[in-house]
């Protein structure tokens, strides 16, 4: 089944059989990408073996899209044994939402959507005010509510250790207490390929199968597997405002401050989140090969353009302690 060409904002390619490379092997020696793939598939199967009701956290970004491909391979020819869970802030890129819906249909996976707006309406979250309001932190109650409502005991995520210092010290199997919180000083040892998924009632785990991957690994894997992505990852013309060194794309949720003005240039996203906190980079890379070259020469980190990470030195760790992804 091919993605419809009637939808804009999509990089159209069919999600072919995930095992298409098996016939291409002429050697038992694995490449570094195949080693990373094998490690991730092993962890996904370990999750299926140890937990009763897992889920895959799906943002619509490149890492979670790669996670879907890995899950297909881990359990082929069966369907994915867990649903995709997306937390919709209401401030997402439209291209991401369209791609999310089509991919879920393409791989025949159940899609569960947690709503930040519903949490605000119910009084469980409060909208930020001020010059730089964001709903990024408000994803926490929406996510924890979805986990509690559906009684998930393990949530697979696409976080990687090279992204940010808080994620660099997190385990593959990351324990969460009954409040959904993470204690970085109380993490379990992980020796070789042994993972301890024991927990008490009401607790759960966050599992990160691609922890050892880098941004370059992800893009090389996307090329190797011919994986389709939302068009915002590729160079396109868009209006934006420069704020504190971050290029924020024009949207109804961003109000210009004194002295600011909209600019227009060719840009793309290196990482995808809310429009209010996802910084773009000026780029002419409009295909995967060009992006791989760009990443190899980059002197700024992948999340260096994320406004939510610039709120403090420990911004990510503080959010994770409260139950963030």
What feature does the model see in each segment?
Residues 16-325:
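Nucleotide-activated chemistry modules centered on ATP-dependent adenylation/adenylyltransferase
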Residues 6-18:
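Short, positively charged and aromatic/hydrophobic N-terminal segments
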